[in-house]
Design a protein with these regions (language model features):
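Surface-exposed, interaction-prone regions used to assemble/regulate multi-protein complexes
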Residues: 2-151
Length: 151
């Protein structure tokens, strides 16, 4: 796989729900891999057709925590994925989750972002991301897709 950065055409934001649905709906996850730690972590979800959806943590690139968002795996997803949803909650300084906001609508503050998938077994958490920004360094995690190679 070539090096993918958040800023090239192969990458897309967590809030691009239609792109995520295009990859996941109708597929099942056969394996979940994790490499790196904290702000360079990449979660890789291997699908039944060989496609891999990668969720990348974000490092804001400064000495502080602005623009830094983690990615943590959720449940072991079982079954065929029927739908995908994103929940973003603006968090309070008291570490209590605040109100649900439109994904991608916040760029200043702190948030918990969850990517859910739905199967015949119900709602399952695929990715949880937490972080903050001051409006300058970037918001949320990002994704990339490695298409299956067919001969």
């Amino acid at each position: 796989m070539s090096e993918v950065s958040r800023w090239n055409d192969a990458a897309f934001e967590y809030s691009e729900i239609d792109r995520i649905r295009d990859v996941l709906v109708g597929r099942s996850i056969t394996n979940t891999l994790s490499r790196g730690s904290d702000l360079d972590r990449v979660l890789s979800f291997v699908l039944d057709d060989g496609t891999v959806l990668n969720a990348h943590a974000a490092d804001g690139g400064c000495a502080c925590s602005n623009g830094c968002f983690t990615v943590e795996p959720g449940n072991t997803v079982r079954g065929t994925i029927l739908n995908v949803e994103i929940e973003e909650r603006a968090t309070e300084w008291s570490d209590e989750e605040g109100k649900v906001v439109e994904p991608g609508s916040v760029s200043d503050g702190s948030a918990t972002i969850r990517l859910f998938v739905y199967t015949d077994l119900g709602q399952q958490t695929l990715v949880t991301s937490e972080g903050s920004d001051n409006g300058y360094y970037g918001w949320g995690f990002w994704l990339s897709v490695d298409k299956a190679v067919t001969a």
